[in-house]
């Protein structure tokens, strides 16, 4: 189970330097969490405010003991288990110029490398482009967004690129982020050959009373323009409907040598993960420890199999061991982190914290 690997690995890692064997264990554990290797962000982008907001909402729900749906993003009302934000890696085609009366503020090619999305994942939402100039435009702008396509010319054996208009809107006041629905486009971009990016054009609003100040407005737009792409994906292999589990009563306090939950706080700084784990800084993982003596009482939360095993152990103690103290109820945690491509990711990981223990 994930928590067992986590506890054993972190417990050792916290007190010794990684030798080859521990390095291998770390790699295996990270792989089980969906990483190809240990992330090492060089110039990590800032965490988008929307991800901080969602993370804090989920932390509040966990404090209130609300069980989250690991395969549904309530904040966007779509199926999904992973939220990613991809920064724009494009370039300006026509940057701002010092024309006295500019007719176009800027033209920029937008490109989002979504190769971090695994082949098994299904894109359930592409929230579009977050256009965040962080500047209040006094008179508004005209905005156009195009998709870049590759068109094959019939009978000529070659192709050319063209643009398909996606959005054409006028914004009177732009003082907050803009989002456009690009779900279908993101789904097609999972084929890298089809990801030719987008083109963003911004024009000053055509009002003669404002054209004299358009230079300053356009210059500010380019200076403060920030674009990113937010996606929600669902991995069907990891989002199978869980089987109904037998419910057990909560364990009361028991003697120190009896099977029960023990406290274990994992601080990511202690194991050298603080560079890529953004939040939380640590969490209460807990673990199970203690004896499962014969006869098993109700407070030890034993299964039918464990009860029978203790009976057989009483007859053949040399051959049959006592049941083990293991988790019977676990809960997930949300983690905000940088992935192997320096993208900011918010993800639920199930079975990360022990809530109750019993003999099995």
UniProtKB/Swiss-Prot annotation:
Entry keyword annotation includes Disulfide bond: yes
Pfam families linked: TGF_beta (PF00019)
Signal peptide stretch: 1-16
Major localization class: secreted
InterPro entries xrefs: Cystine-knot_cytokine, TGF-b_C, TGF-beta-rel, TGFb_CS
Propeptide part(s) removed at maturation, as residue ranges: 17-246
Transmembrane segments: none
Residues with glycosylation annotation: 113, 181, 301
Disulfide bonds: 259-325, 288-357, 292-359
Keywords on record: Cleavage on pair of basic residues, Disulfide bond, Glycoprotein, Growth factor, Mitogen, Secreted, Signal
Subcellular localization: Secreted
Any GO molecular function: cytokine activity
Example GO biological process: positive regulation of cell division
Quaternary data: Homodimer.
Family: Belongs to the TGF-beta family.
PANTHER family in alphabetical order: PROTEIN DVR-1, TGF-BETA FAMILY
Role: Serves to facilitate the differentiation of either mesoderm or endoderm either as a cofactor in an instructive signal or by providing permissive environment.
Protein name: Protein DVR-1
Organism, scientific name: Xenopus laevis (African clawed frog)
């Amino acid at each position: 189970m994930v928590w067992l690997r986590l506890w054993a690995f972190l417990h050792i890692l916290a007190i010794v330097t990684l030798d080859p064997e521990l390095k291998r264990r770390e790699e295996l554990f990270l792989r089980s969490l969906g990483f190809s290797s240990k992330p090492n962000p060089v110039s990590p982008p800032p965490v988008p405010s929307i991800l901080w907001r969602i993370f804090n909402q989920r932390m509040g729900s966990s404090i209130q003991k609300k069980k989250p749906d690991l395969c549904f993003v309530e904040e966007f009302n779509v199926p999904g288990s992973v939220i990613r934000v991809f920064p724009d890696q494009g370039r300006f085609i026509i940057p701002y110029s010092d024309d006295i009366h500019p007719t176009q503020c800027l033209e920029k090619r937008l490109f989002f490398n979504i190769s971090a999305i695994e082949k098994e994942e299904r894109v359930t939402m592409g929230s579009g482009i977050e256009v965040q100039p962080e500047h209040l435009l006094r008179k508004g702008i005209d905005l156009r967004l195009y998709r870049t396509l590759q068109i094959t010319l019939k009978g000529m054996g070659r192709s050319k690129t063209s643009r398909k208009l996606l959005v054409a809107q006028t914004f009177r006041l732009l003082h907050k982020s803009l989002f456009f629905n690009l779900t279908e486009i993101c789904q097609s971009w999972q084929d890298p050959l089809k990801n030719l990016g987008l083109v963003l054009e911004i024009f000053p609003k055509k009002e003669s009373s404002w054209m004299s100040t358009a230079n300053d407005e356009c210059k500010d737009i380019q200076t403060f323009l920030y674009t990113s792409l937010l996606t929600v994906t669902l991995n069907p292999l990891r989002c199978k409907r869980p089987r109904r589990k037998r419910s057990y009563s909560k364990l009361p306090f028991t003697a120190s040598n009896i099977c029960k939950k023990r406290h274990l706080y994992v601080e990511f700084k202690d194991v050298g993960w603080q560079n890529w784990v953004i939040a939380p800084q640590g969490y209460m993982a807990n673990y199970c420890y203690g004896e499962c003596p014969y006869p098993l009482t109700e407070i030890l939360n034993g299964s039918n199999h464990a009860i029978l095993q203790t009976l057989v152990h009483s007859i053949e103690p040399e051959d049959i061991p006592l049941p083990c103290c293991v988790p019977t109820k676990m809960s997930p945690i949300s983690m905000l982190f940088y992935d192997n491509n320096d993208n900011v990711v918010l993800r639920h990981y199930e079975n990360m914290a022990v809530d109750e223990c019993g003999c099995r």
